[in-house]
Amino acid sequence: MNAPLVGPSGRSPHWVANAVLATIAGIGRSLDVALQAATGGASRRRSADRQLLEEFILPTFSLDRSIKRVLFCGCARYTQAYEGLFPHSEYWTLDPSPRRQRFGSKLHVVDRLEALHRHAVGPLDLIICNGVLGWGINDTEQAEAAIRAAHAALASRGRLLLGWNDVAPRNRVRPEHITALAAFTPAPLSHFGARVRVPGWHRHVFDFYRKA
């Protein structure tokens, strides 16, 4: 077997790789059908990190019934079906561009994450911020404000997912350099560690946190 996609936490690499493959094999086809139906056949990004997000990370979060209110930051055609993966949650989306509102959920906010305090969306149990660091949140001041806003909006023990590309110039603001993240603790998801690195040219990283 090839080397596993990501580094595990407390499990052997082969055990984790097999678990991921089994999960994807079991739900991948049904998710493809559901997502295509929900988007009217809209195109989806099939990079390794997007596949991991859609076929493992989001479904794992959706199975946690303590997650009752979700905010997904950043909207595009290929994200508009994600609302259907959280049938038991109140699902919000956020994007600063009015043109992207059509890709958002029924509960949508047109604004930046830094300004989340202006909107009555909390308390949230999960904030998903994938592909926003380096793609809109581009400097330390913006990142600090965004993480502070996320922390304020999250319920006690709420979860935060940061997905970012560890390649210049997208990694100009690394999570390690965001002091506001000191108010969170790393929080492994299922069989993965608190940091998941996905091989590929853009070196995507998923970081999982819980509000301290």
Task: Describe the residue ranges of each PLM region.
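Class I SAM-dependent methyltransferase Rossmann-like catalytic core
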Residues: 4-65
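Short amphipathic alpha-helix with an adjacent loop that forms part of the alpha/beta core around
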Residues: 60-62, 114-122
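Class I SAM-dependent methyltransferase SAM/SAH-binding core
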Residues: 69-116
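A short glycine-rich, Lys/Arg-flanked "PGG" loop and its adjoining helix->strand segment in the class I
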Residues: 142-156
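Conserved beta-strand signature within the Rossmann-like core of class I S-adenosyl-L-methionine
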Residues: 156-165
